[in-house]
Curated annotation (Swiss-Prot):
Domain Protein kinase as annotated: residue spans: 266-519
Biased composition annotated in UniProt, kind: Polar residues: 26-40
InterPro entries: Kinase-like_dom_sf, Non-receptor_tyrosine_kinases, Prot_kinase_dom, Protein_kinase_ATP_BS, Ser-Thr/Tyr_kinase_cat_dom, SH2, SH2_dom_sf, SH3-like_dom_sf
List of catalytic residues: D385 (proton acceptor)
Protein name: Tyrosine-protein kinase Src-2
Gene (name only): src-b
Catalytic reactions of this protein: L-tyrosyl-[protein] + ATP = O-phospho-L-tyrosyl-[protein] + ADP + H(+)
Native species: Xenopus laevis
Residue span, SH2 domain: 147-244
Region (Disordered): 1-56
Length: 532
């Protein structure tokens, strides 16, 4: 089907089938030849105005946002004069200037100076319009292969492959995290002792340009390697049976130039939550695109200050941060973000699904949050209100950090007094609660409290204690005891987050690495290829 400027429809996740050309599977037989995280320098933005907010609901309600696993960004600036790209997904236009296209369609890039949205012409229909740059890849490149997911982590690969719907032998190819220029083949497996698990095989490059997992079987391209192992296990845990499914990625923004948008372009459809400072709605932008909309009560924050902060927030882009799409900057302020289907982590933990979560899932969710916060740390930003109510959950237990930075702008007296009823004392580091010193290290303290929310399935921290009592006791050195059924190693991690001296608390980089490796510290990084 050719490209059109038709009325968009919501598209679902793409399903992937193994489609390998005949004759491409023959190898050629030439026979030529736990990471310790570094402690980053923590810097922070000026603490600015004190914040707070301690109602049962998050300041913006217990919300719901995007329900997709973000597919990795697989395209970049055009190199070597390449202007012909292939579509990785279907895309339906959202505005009159967008171009609809179908997966597999070939597109000529007219102008790629527009950042996230490129002007392109369909080679099948001849029509021209803007396309999301992360929905296409250079024709005939490795990035255009369905099974190639680029720069995703080992843990993210396992998260995708361990879906119960995947048959044994489901696979993907990604960049190696440990060896520059090498790749990794990740394959789902099953055995009676371990149940579902994932095996990782390093794909090495030959000086001559070929590829191999074991030196006795070599290939001229990754496509040949995948085709061969789809027919022969030849020492792998299983032959390759199906490409790992992923969902469409979020576009970077709603469309080209859609940032400050008119209020009447939004339709509020279903109220999802209500908090101290506003409401959260599921809605539609421009009649085409599902979004979440936060409506702030007039007087909650200065529109000018919000717009200035939002310009910074929209530049924060990470697969574990809820994406800020657009704003209505006149009061009542609207904040438009990606929509996630499972609501806030707090509601999720306390709800029906919470009872089925076991330690591996809880640790994985914590690792995802730490990953998003490690990015915030690298960007020298501060969240200021990190807790389960401000984490959002999508399909497949995907977690994303929301509401970063907004707390600094709130002007409500009960929020800014730091002792008021709306201030989240129980999550706040003592130096922030007492003196307004909000840094990435006070976020680390809050993360330790969030870990107790995870391990207790949403219990309020410091049970039986009121805010004033918590502040007094913490100042005297009190720390929460180990929650029931929580491993001592996790409780020790919480204690590290609650050290009195902020500089002695771990970095989010360290927390991410610790949690991602929590169950894999004794496993080899890769299966031994030359023993196949």
């Amino acid at each position: 089907m050719g490209a059109t400027k038709s009325k968009p429809r919501e598209g679902g996740p793409r399903s992937r089938s193994l489609d390998i050309a005949e004759g491409s599977h023959q190898p050629f037989t030439s026979l030529s030849a736990s990471q310790t995280p570094s402690k980053s320098l923590d810097s922070h933005r000026p603490s600015g105005q004190p914040f707070g907010g301690n109602c049962d609901l998050t300041p913006f309600g217990g919300v719901n946002f995007s329900d997709t696993i973000t597919s990795p960004q697989r395209t970049g600036p055009l190199a070597g004069g390449v202007t012909t790209f292939v579509a990785l997904y279907d895309y339906e236009s959202r505005t009159e200037t967008d171009l609809s296209f179908r997966k597999g369609e070939r597109l000529q890039i007219v102008n790629n100076t527009e950042g996230d949205w490129w002007l392109a012409r369909s080679l099948s229909s001849g029509q021209t319009g803007y396309i999301p740059s992360n929905y296409v890849a250079p024709s005939d490149s490795i990035q255009a292969e369905e099974w190639y997911l680029g720069k995703i982590t080992r843990r993210e690969a396992e998260r995708l492959l361990l879906s119960l719907e995947n048959p044994r032998g489901t696979f993907l190819v990604r960049e190696s995290e440990t060896t520059k220029g090498a790749y990794c083949l990740s394959v789902s497996d099953y055995d009676a002792s371990r149940g579902l698990n994932v095996k990782h095989y390093k794909i090495r490059k030959l000086d001559s340009g070929g590829f191999y997992i074991t030196s006795r079987t070599q290939f001229s391209s990754l496509q040949q390697l995948v085709a061969y192992y789809s027919k022969h296990a030849d020492g792998l845990c299983h032959r390759l049976t199906a490409v790992c499914p992923t969902a469409k990625p979020q576009t970077q923004g709603l469309s080209k130039d859609a940032w400050e948008i008119p209020r009447d372009s939004l339709r509020l459809e279903l109220k999802l939550g209500q908090g101290c400072f506003g409401e959260v709605w599921m809605g539609t932008w421009n009649g085409t695109t599902r979004v979440a909309i936060k409506t702030l009560k007039p007087g909650t924050m200065s529109p000018e200050a919000f717009l200035q902060e939002a310009q910074v927030m929209k530049k924060l882009r990470h697969e574990k941060l809820v994406q800020l799409y657009a704003v209505v900057s006149e009061e009542p302020i609207y904040i438009v973000t990606e929509y996630m289907s499972k609501g806030s982590l707090l509601d999720f933990l306390k709800g029906e699904m919470g009872r089925y979560l076991r330690l591996p899932q809880l640790v994985d969710m914590a690792a995802q949050i730490a990953s998003g916060m490690a990015y915030v740390e690298r960007m020298n930003y501060v969240h200021r209100d990190l807790r389960a109510a401000n984490i959002l959950v999508g399909e497949n237990l995907v977690c994303k950090v929301a509401d970063f930075g907004l707390a600094r702008l709130i002007e409500d007296n009960e929020y800014t007094a730091r002792q008021g009823a709306k201030f989240p004392i129980k999550w706040t580091a003592p130096e922030a609660a007492l003196y307004g010193r909000f840094t990435i290290k006070s976020d680390v303290w809050s993360f330790g409290i969030l870990l107790t929310e995870l391990t207790t399935k949403g219990r309020v921290p410091y049970p039986g204690m009121v805010n004033r009592e918590v502040l007094d006791q913490v100042e005297r050195g009190y720390r929460m005891p180990c929650p029931p059924d929580c491993p001592e190693s996790l409780h020790d991690l919480m204690f590290q987050c609650w050290r009195k001296d902020p500089e002695e608390r771990p970095t989010f980089e360290y927390l991410q690495a610790f949690l991602e490796d929590y169950f894999t510290a004794t496993e080899p990084q890769y299966q031994p290829g030359d023993n196949l």
